[in-house]
């Protein structure tokens, strides 16, 4: 079983040591626009899967999204620890949705 941190490390290692023919290398070679397109596609697929019955499709699509998010983080120079740190700052804090009028009525 692979956890998110080891997935991030694998993606970062692939960027540092490209392997010809790998999908990860393909994404890094194509660049940010391709990576963003894939993140958008996978996000949409997660939403659609969540609306469908059962959880197998949602599980599959969520794994795809998490992988592509890790590629995006590596491409943008963010580390897994950066994200853990940000999550740690939020721990125990109550979100004040009044500060976000764009989500108030969702």
From Swiss-Prot:
One Pfam entry name: PRA-PH
Protein's cellular compartments: Cytoplasm
Protein name: Phosphoribosyl-ATP pyrophosphatase
Family classification: Belongs to the PRA-PH family.
Any single Gene Ontology cellular-component annotation: cytoplasm
GO terms (BP aspect): L-histidine biosynthetic process
Pathway field: Amino-acid biosynthesis; L-histidine biosynthesis; L-histidine from 5-phospho-alpha-D-ribose 1-diphosphate: step 2/9
Gene name as annotated: hisE
Main location (coarse class): cytoplasm
Keywords: Amino-acid biosynthesis, ATP-binding, Cytoplasm, Histidine biosynthesis, Hydrolase, Nucleotide-binding
NCBIfam families on file: histidine_hisI (TIGR03188)
Enzyme Commission numbers on file: 3.6.1.31
SUPFAM superfamilies per the UniProt record, alphabetical: all-alpha NTP pyrophosphatases
Origin species: Limosilactobacillus fermentum (strain NBRC 3956 / LMG 18251) (Lactobacillus fermentum)
């Amino acid at each position: 079983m692979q956890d998110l941190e080891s997935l991030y490390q694998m993606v970062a290692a692939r960027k540092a040591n490209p392997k010809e023919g790998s999908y990860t290398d393909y994404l890094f070679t194509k660049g940010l626009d391709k990576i963003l397109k894939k993140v958008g596609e996978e996000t949409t697929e997660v939403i659609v899967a969540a609306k469908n019955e059962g959880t197998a499709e949602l599980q599959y699509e969520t794994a795809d999204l998490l992988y592509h998010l890790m590629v995006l983080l590596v491409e943008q120079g963010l580390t897994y620890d950066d994200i853990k740190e940000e999550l740690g700052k939020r721990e125990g804090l109550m979100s004040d949705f009044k500060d976000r009028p764009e989500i108030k009525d969702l």
